Amino acid sequence: MPMTGLLQTTLSTADQDRSGPAATTGDTPARANTKRLHVITWGCQMNVYDSARMTDVLSPLGYTAHAEPEGADMIVLNTCHIRDKATEKVFSELGRLRLLKEARAREGQPMLLAVAGCVAQAEGEQILARAPYVDIVLGPQTYHRLGGMVRRAMNGERVIETDFPPEDKFDYLPEAAAPQHGPGLAGGRTAFLTIQEGCDKFCSFCVVPYTRGAEVSRPASSVLAEARRMVRGGAREITLLGQNVNAYHGLGEDGEVWTLARLIRALADIPDLLRIRYTTSHPRDVSDDLIAAHRDIPQLMPFLHLPVQSGSDRILAAMNRRHTAEDYFRVVDRLREARPDLALSSDFIVGHPGETDEDFEDTMRLIERVGFAQAYSFKYSPRPGTPAAERDNHVPEPVMDERLQRLQALLRTQQEAFNTACIGKTVNVLLVTPGRHPGQIGGRSPWLQAVHLDAPATLIGQEVPVTITAAHTNSLSATLPDCAPHPKELTCA
């Protein structure tokens, strides 16, 4: 399963850490022998987490985060392979970075250039062949070895490490220096925490099993220790990450294998951790105890990203999803019975090879039947090496365009209706960042909507009741009610 909610902008590690307790940016005077590191992050939330951990790995070598590529002693491009033309986008960016490297060389200041992430894993040899100025190519399972790779590169070696190592990288990564915050959210009030990596599902369209490997789960003790450090650093909401996160099966502190639900129950006991989320999930791994966790644990937010991809049983079989539309309906109904205020988001692919008009109409009917608060939708794009790419019954581009427009129009209508239904409700919002206007602050609703209101900045980091006054395409406006009590969360459905 690919992670979703893809970040469409380029993010640097310094952007993530600028307001954190251990932040170092380009505005901070460099210590003696300090080297400046700029990390460009493309793709999913796990890549954001990985970029921060690579920064931690390089810290003992004297590297600190630098806000801009200009002036950096090392640049890491952390890549994503999910969308179309991913490889060519990487080479385009590398061409830009090459100019910076050459300019630094003319000044007698060498710069290391590394390519990490899923494109590096899939195209490692090609990157070295087409971009001879790249010093290091490393896949997602070798980040714990990055320090050694840097030493080799500084001695003139061109390094490529894309094999899956026998050791588990989670056993060797250093402790996180600071919370890994969500993009654009100040103060580290929200954090990403990877607990599981890889996928064993092998959907026909997906490269993740080939770039991230088999499913691996972190020991519960490691997850809990990092979560406690994040909370001590100011995090009040933690999102648990995994390519197939609800397949989590880490070794527990009692020696038993823990499920995701059991891990969430342990996390809920951490003082001052107000909110827990997880992404991305597979419908086949929504277990009875996970449904019970949604019913029983108030810290577990009533918002779930549950990709379905298609509403056609025939296409679901072609995708190797190993569930039917009816299976998905049953899971959704059970979740909503357990947590009536639960809102859903999902992923949809239109134009998978062999998709007919009737298959597409099945998808539209599924969307109408379920109702989504938000969703991500894409045209099918063949990924080299995947079974779907080898098929010869591809859907014409104009047909995919028309289907995507119809599907997105329906999803947009549902999202607007969900947001509009919030008007007049009082909901708990975690306030996380100053707003774009003076006197304004921003936060997150339980359903992951951005919420903006006029309120003092001293409230940042708190979860407070607000009254929703207006709905916009991607956000809500709110005011602080006159009442002092902390109300129960109310559904906007």
Swiss-Prot record:
Domain Radical SAM core stretches: 185-417
Required cofactor names: [4Fe-4S] cluster
GO MF, one annotated term: 4 iron, 4 sulfur cluster binding
Region ranges (Disordered): 1-31
Domain MTTase N-terminal positions: 35-155
Domain TRAM per the UniProt entry, residue ranges: 420-482
Residues that coordinate or bind [4Fe-4S] cluster 1: 44, 80, 118
Annotated EC: 2.8.4.3
Subcellular compartments: Cytoplasm
Cellular-component GO terms for this entry: cytosol
The keyword 4Fe-4S appears for this protein: yes
Subunit organization: Monomer.
Protein name: tRNA-2-methylthio-N(6)-dimethylallyladenosine synthase
Taxonomic lineage of the native organism: Bacteria, Pseudomonadati, Pseudomonadota, Alphaproteobacteria, Acetobacterales
